[in-house]
Each structure stands twice: as structure tokens, then as C-alpha cells.
């Protein structure tokens, strides 16, 4: 929430150029409506060095962790439907498998040095 008085507004930043803007907006809207419906109080505004803070909730650190979180999300299934969630799960699992198959230049250099 930014501004004050007549200039008070809610800012929603796009998550990234690779995100579907319609899906991102739909999920953001669903989250806001869920917060209103369930009277969820937002946390206090954070002040300080977010990188040094140890007690903040964390987002997944890898695609595998993100897939596991998505698999468990009943909220998102309710918000956008099982079919959409399953489609994205299939896509992300395929993406992870393809990533796992790649041998990086670091691996080549590191392990050819040892042989």
C-alpha cells in the first residue's frame, strides 16, 4: 500500500517477464479475496535488512522445492482449479528433468581435472 489520502493505492508488481500476466493477476486477486473472506491480518511492514533477517518466512529455494510446495497446495487448486495446477506441475517436472540431464561446463572442468 503506497501513498496517502486520495493518492492511496495498492501496488502489485509483476513477478517476472516469464510469468503469465493473466494467471499472476488472477492468483493475486484470489489471494486478496481470500484474505478478506477469512479476515487474515497482513504482517507488519518489515523494516531493516531483509537479507540479514533470520526469522522471515522463506519461499522455496529450488524448482524441486517449488514443485513440492505446489503439489501440497490445496489453496491454489481451489483458486485456479486442479487442471491448471496439474498442467503447471507437468511442465515444471519436465523442466526439472531436462535441467537435471544437462552437464554443465563447471562439471566438465571439475571432473575431467580429476581423471
Spans of features found by a protein language model:
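Catalytic-core signal marking the mid-to-C-terminal active-site face
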Residues: 1-115
Amino acid at each position: 500500500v503506497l501513498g496517502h489520502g486520495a493518492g492511496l493505492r495498492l501496488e502489485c508488481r509483476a513477478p517476472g517477464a516469464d510469468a503469465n500476466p493473466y494467471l499472476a493477476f488472477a492468483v493475486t486477486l484470489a489471494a486478496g479475496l481470500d484474505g478478506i473472506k477469512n479476515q487474515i491480518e497482513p504482517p507488519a511492514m518489515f523494516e531493516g535488512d531483509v537479507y540479514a533477517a533470520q526469522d522471515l518466512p522463506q519461499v522455496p529455494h529450488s524448482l524441486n522445492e517449488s514443485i513440492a510446495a505446489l503439489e501440497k497446495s490445496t489453496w491454489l487448486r481451489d483458486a485456479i482449479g486442479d487442471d491448471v495446477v496439474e498442467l503447471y506441475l507437468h511442465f515444471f517436472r519436465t523442466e526439472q528433468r531436462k535441467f537435471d540431464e544437462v552437464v554443465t561446463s563447471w562439471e566438465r572442468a571439475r571432473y575431467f581435472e580429476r581423471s
